[in-house]
Amino acid sequence: MHAEHSVAQDAFTEKHNSGYSLSPQIYYANMYFAMAEICDTLQKDLKKSIEFKQKGTTILNNVKSQYWNAEKGCFASGPRGSEAYEKGIWEATGAEACVWPKFHVSDHQQRQIFLQTIKTQKNALNDFGLNWYPFEEGKNHFWNTCWVSWTEGIAVAANHEGDMELLRKLIFQQVRNVVVNKTFHEAVDYSTGRAWRWPGLTWHASAFLGYFMFGLLGMSYEKEGLLISPCIPQEFSHMKLCNLRYRDAVFEIEICGSGNQFDIYVDDSKTEFIDVAIKGRHRVMLCPKH
């Protein structure tokens, strides 16, 4: 699918991607899957559903075969034959979409390798955030800038791979931003940590909570209910999350230790899964396995 720039920005043509930037491919593939799901749920246009699934699968297979550069340890922001692929150039939104398990792009090994690349790539990750464009030397509100919402999926990937060091770093980047600025800015300067653009943004406040819900607690919403797969660094070993609404239920979630192997208790009953039909107020305890 022709796309001259990543979803990270809407101002510049990214010539090194040869007209086929990575992140839009992933979003469009999942758009087709979502449209198919709507058709199936409503039991309407079922022929269209098949067509949508085929299109989504084709795009996703192309991403897997054309953008993964094993030598550079990344999903490049352009396909095979592009400058981005040859040099192993990547950007944050493509990286996030590739490693976020819900988008079904990377396998376990690729996810681990790419997370390691993100951690070790020069000019990619510091105490202030993830640089949207680690390979660009200029500075504007896209280049050498961190945008708060766009690393949540990397936090989820860190949870899946049990990478507490990375998960901890990603969360504390956001804690720092909030404590220092006392509001939710969108753009943070990668070099200085100065939050300089668009304060008070509700979707970045939501993303801040998402680091805890989906990164730390490993929550995922399924048709049948709610899954919780915690990965808890020591600093969060006694955290409470109160008044969390899930459909017709309200949860008080309490963490009782650290690690990535937990038993889940709802009102003192051990469970692997919280059913979608649950109602009322409930206490959810996350207890390390012994």
In which residue ranges do the predicted regions lie?
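Aromatic- and histidine-enriched alpha-helix N-cap/loop-to-helix transition segments
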Residues: 19-30, 88-93, 145-153, 162, ...
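Active-site neighborhood of glycoside hydrolase catalytic domains
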Residues: 22-67
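Solenoid-repeat scaffolds in large eukaryotic assemblies
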Residues: 49, 56, 110-111, 166-167
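C-terminal extensions
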Residues: 33-38, 56, 62, 87-97, ...
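Non-catalytic C-terminal accessory modules of carbohydrate-active enzymes
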Residues: 156-290
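Extended glycan-interaction surfaces of carbohydrate-active proteins
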Residues: 1-20, 61-148, 169-192, 217, ...
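Conserved aromatic-histidine-acidic binding/catalytic patches
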Residues: 16, 20-23, 44, 48-51, ...
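Well-ordered alpha-helical scaffold segments within catalytic/enzyme domains
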Residues: 26-45, 95-108, 152-164, 211-220
